[in-house]
């Protein structure tokens, strides 16, 4: 890039520059560590403020250019003279919200060559956010862009000066010699030495196990097992904070309201999900205690819904609360949006999409089955391969768990087929939530919750619609695990008490599906498995590396939201434990599922083949043919997967012209080695890891990472409120067993089936908490970046990469039109269902708010 341009600068020439930054007071909500602080201060005086822009002038901030072409006596790029910000640029068309621009001039001459990096020092007490530096008027070279997006603290906090590189792209072996030292030094700086408690201003990326979920110092009931680092509880790694161990358990880390993040992983942009995320924290710290007092201390309102109409009242008239309670939870702006107070002491939720057209469509068997293909958890259903379904649990410990569903249960409804013929024709399907819960079921049922392990068998009719034929509810044998399971089989019914029993049977299935969705499909398979990639990438791939530039948009805000989850959602006594059936065992159970996690099966085509939902077919797009043609998640997902993979292929081919070049890339090989051996270290000996020896290995790995962080997360996250906002449709816990004939509960089921259903599923208090959380999780921020978008048009100087990226964006726009046309095809019944709710979750674009569409680049909420 810089070869052949040395000597083109006139001696004594001044290089003109523009620095864009953001003051802390317009940006940084993260300086407030408690929601109470947010509520008490309001959003007009966030953090320590810099009163005005003139504070940046004088000798407050210095910059020093580094040559990319001229070395000093030690071989390092020559340093220019330090210079300071000169004046405020009052108007600049490219400035974003909250950004300020400053003029700067650098003394430079032909002995210095071409700038390729710069140092910056902040001499003020308050940090600021550096957005970019642009150098103009470089003879015969044009402009040089430095995309920074980083917090700059007072220089005393840094042993090594903060450095930024121009937006060129280099493999390690192609780095201009004068920049090699600086490139390696910056990576070493980001890795740290693995010791000590991390400080707010640090940018160190390191690994740790999940040892901060519990609080053993508060008692045995508050302790949680350490996840990761053992054969019993394998888990992906999280970011290391270095907090002190707890007093009672040296293996557990003490908890605090402040959770260290590498500073640039905390939201560093004007992002409404700052408010969404702190809204999540507010639900945990403010809303939960306030509502607990309403339901359990004041007895202001009963904790049971009386009828389905009362549930619908949450969206119509709202729920009345005492005035003082409202005043505790509504001042935070995001909560004002979520809890629509009407001035009459009521909280009101927006109506979820699942009831916007039909209030009763959710109750139908067709919708129950359709949501397995187009709902919020569409990647669990399998094509039935053997009958009866068998368990993979160790029979030496758990006995025989073979399904009790028989041919007699199924064949009357197979349209003349035998079970064997239906399996051969790929007409039978299974939603299996048996093995994941059974080892914990005895413990779960010893609390106030009552649940079953479930298996659901469905039939694909000639209209491509699934219909449930049988549901098996299983309990551990009362005489001990080794005796197997006690199972009950239920079949569809349309009227009488049998229809009420059938609705309850479906509810037990959905409770299991809700837990599996939240803890596995959502948390584990997107949030948790991606975090090690974020850490490894920052530790081993320089920002000059092409693969860093490819992947970094797909990491935006992920470590931040994950740290918040450990603080308020998946921790001991957190919102997940309070509102979901798995309770205190939630994270532990997700660890058991991670035992069977296979990285290469996270590619959508491989996942579909594994579940029997597709067969290999070289003549079909993505090399697979779907077993269910009208499978909205899979049909749309394969389109998105193909576009992602094509973009990755196009990009990778620009920099790796041979497999040998990839094998010799020291940063890439160190990145992959550490990702496998440390980041996912509990799986390091698995044979299925790509060896990172070929370009195809790299393309597949990057495609899986981008797919997981973008489209997969979008599919399992942004429909949560649209489907689960109606607790009747997606209950999160069950509190009673199926009523037995002759019991009072059975009589209630006969006389008041709605009341019996409501007494079985999630009660009112947990419902309000659940709805509050999933409404926040389902929202898009105002400045969300979607697939095909970047935060800066100058993210690379490589015009070939920019052209390939433009092609990627155009393809995504084309596919969105295609998906819209598909949703208008009335023959594709699974795209709407009885609730008349088009499947839009994989539309690439979206506006702000609750939209039920849009694929953000990253796991940012």
UniProtKB/Swiss-Prot annotation:
It comes from Pisum sativum (Garden pea). The keyword Ribonucleoprotein does not apply. Fe cation binds at residues 522, 527, 713, 717, 861. This is Seed linoleate 9S-lipoxygenase-3. SUPFAM superfamilies: Lipase/lipooxygenase domain (PLAT/LH2 domain), Lipoxigenase. It catalyses: (9Z,12Z)-octadecadienoate + O2 = (9S)-hydroperoxy-(10E,12Z)-octadecadienoate. Binds 1 Fe cation per subunit. Residues 237-246 have a biased composition (Basic residues). InterPro entries: LipOase, LipOase_C, LipOase_C_sf, LipOase_CS, LipOase_Fe_BS, LipOase_plant, Lipoxy_PLAT/LH2, Lipoxygenase_dom_3.
């Amino acid at each position: 890039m810089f070869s052949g341009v040395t000597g083109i600068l006139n001696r004594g020439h001044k290089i003109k520059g523009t620095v864009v930054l953001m003051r802390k007071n317009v940006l940084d909500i993260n300086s407030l560590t408690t929601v109470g602080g947010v509520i008490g201060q309001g959003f007009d005086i966030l953090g320590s403020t810099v009163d005005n822009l003139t504070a940046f002038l004088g000798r407050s901030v210095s910059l020093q250019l580094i040559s990319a072409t001229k070395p000093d006596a030690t071989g390092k790029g020559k340093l220019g003279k330090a210079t300071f910000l000169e004046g405020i640029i009052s108007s600049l068309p490219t400035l974003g919200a909250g950004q300020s621009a400053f003029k700067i001039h650098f003394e430079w001459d032909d002995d210095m060559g071409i700038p390729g990096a710069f140092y910056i020092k902040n001499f003020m007490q308050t940090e600021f956010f550096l957005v970019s530096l642009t150098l103009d008027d470089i003879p015969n070279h044009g402009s040089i862009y430095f995309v920074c997006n980083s917090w700059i603290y007072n220089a005393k906090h840094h042993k090594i000066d903060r450095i930024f590189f121009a937006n060129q792209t280099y493999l390690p072996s192609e780095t201009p010699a004068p920049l090699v030292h600086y490139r390696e030094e910056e990576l070493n700086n980001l890795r740290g030495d693995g010791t000590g408690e991390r400080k707010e201003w640090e940018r160190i990326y390191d690994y740790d196990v999940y040892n901060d979920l519990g609080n053993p110092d508060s008692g045995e009931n508050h302790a949680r097992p350490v996840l990761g680092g053992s054969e019993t509880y394998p888990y992906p790694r999280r970011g290391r904070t270095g907090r002190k161990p707890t007093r009672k358990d040296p293996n557990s880390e003490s908890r605090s309201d402040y959770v260290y993040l590498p500073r640039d992983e905390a939201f560093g942009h004007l992002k409404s999900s700052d408010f969404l995320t702190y809204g999540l924290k507010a639900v945990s710290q403010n809303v939960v205690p306030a509502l607990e007092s309403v339901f359990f201390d004041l007895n202001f309102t009963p904790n049971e819904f009386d009828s389905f109409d009362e549930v619908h009242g949450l969206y119509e008239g709202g729920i009345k609360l005492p005035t003082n309670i409202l005043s505790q939870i509504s001042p935070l702006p995001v909560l004002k949006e979520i809890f629509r107070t009407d001035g009459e002491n009521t909280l009101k939720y927006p109506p979820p999409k699942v009831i916007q057209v039909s209030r009763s469509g959710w109750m139908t068997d067709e919708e129950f089955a359709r949501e397995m293909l187009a709902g919020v958890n569409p990647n669990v259903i399998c094509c039935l391969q053997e009958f009866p379904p068998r368990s993979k649990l160790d029979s030496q410990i758990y006995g025989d768990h073979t399904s009790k569903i028989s041919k007699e249960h199924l064949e009357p409804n197979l349209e003349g087929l035998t079970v064997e013929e239906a399996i051969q024709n790929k007409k039978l399907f299974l939603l299996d939530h048996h093995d994941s819960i059974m080892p914990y079921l005895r413990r779960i049922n010893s609390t106030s919750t009552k649940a079953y392990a479930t298996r659901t068998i469905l039939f694909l009719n000639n209209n491509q619609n699934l219909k449930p034929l049988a549901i098996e509810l299983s309990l551990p044998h009362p005489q001990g695990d080794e005796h197997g399971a006690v199972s009950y089989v239920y079949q569809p019914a349309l009227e009488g008490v049998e229809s009420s029993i059938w609705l309850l049977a479906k509810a037990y299935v959905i409770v299991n599906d809700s837990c599996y969705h939240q803890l596995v499909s959502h948390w584990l398979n997107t949030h948790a498995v991606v975090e090690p990639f974020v850490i490894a990438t920052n530790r081993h791939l320089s920002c000059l590396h092409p693969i860093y530039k490819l992947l970094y948009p797909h990491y935006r805000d992920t470590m931040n939201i994950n740290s918040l989850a450990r603080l308020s959602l998946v921790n001991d006594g957190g919102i997940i434990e309070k509102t979901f059936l798995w309770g205190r065992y939630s994270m532990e159970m997700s660890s058991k599922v991670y035992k069977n996690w296979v990285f290469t099966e996270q590619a959508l085509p491989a996942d579909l083949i594994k579940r029997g939902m597709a067969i290999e077919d070289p003549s079909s797009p993505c090399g697979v043919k779907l077993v269910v043609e009208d499978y909205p998640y899979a049909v749309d997902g394969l389109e998105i997967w193909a576009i992602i993979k094509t973009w990755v292929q196009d990009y990778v081919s620009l920099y790796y012209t041979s497999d040998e070049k990839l094998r010799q890339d020291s940063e890439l090989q160190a990145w992959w080695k550490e990702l496998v051996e440390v980041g996912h270290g509990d799986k390091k000996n698995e044979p299925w890891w790509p060896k990172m020896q070929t370009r195809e290995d790299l393309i597949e790995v990057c495609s899986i990472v981008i797919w997981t962080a973008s489209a997969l997360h979008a599919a399992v996250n942004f429909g949560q409120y649209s489907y689960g906002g109606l607790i009747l449709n997606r209950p999160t816990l069950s509190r009673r067993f199926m009523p037995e004939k002759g019991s009072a509960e059975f009589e209630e089921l006969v006389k008041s089936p709605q009341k019996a259903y409501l007494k079985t599923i999630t009660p009112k208090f947990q419902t309000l908490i659940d709805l509050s959380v999933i409404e926040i999780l389902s929202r898009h921020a105002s400045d969300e970046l979607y697939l095909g978008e970047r935060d800066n048009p100058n993210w690379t100087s490589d015009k070939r990469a920019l052209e390939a990226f433009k092609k990627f964006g155009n393809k995504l726009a084309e596919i969105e039109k295609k998906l819209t046309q598909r949703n208008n095809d009335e023959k594709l019944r699974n795209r709407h269902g009885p609730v008349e709710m088009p499947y839009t979750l994989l539309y690439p674009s979206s506006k702000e708010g609750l939209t039920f569409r849009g694929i953000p680049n990253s796991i940012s909420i």
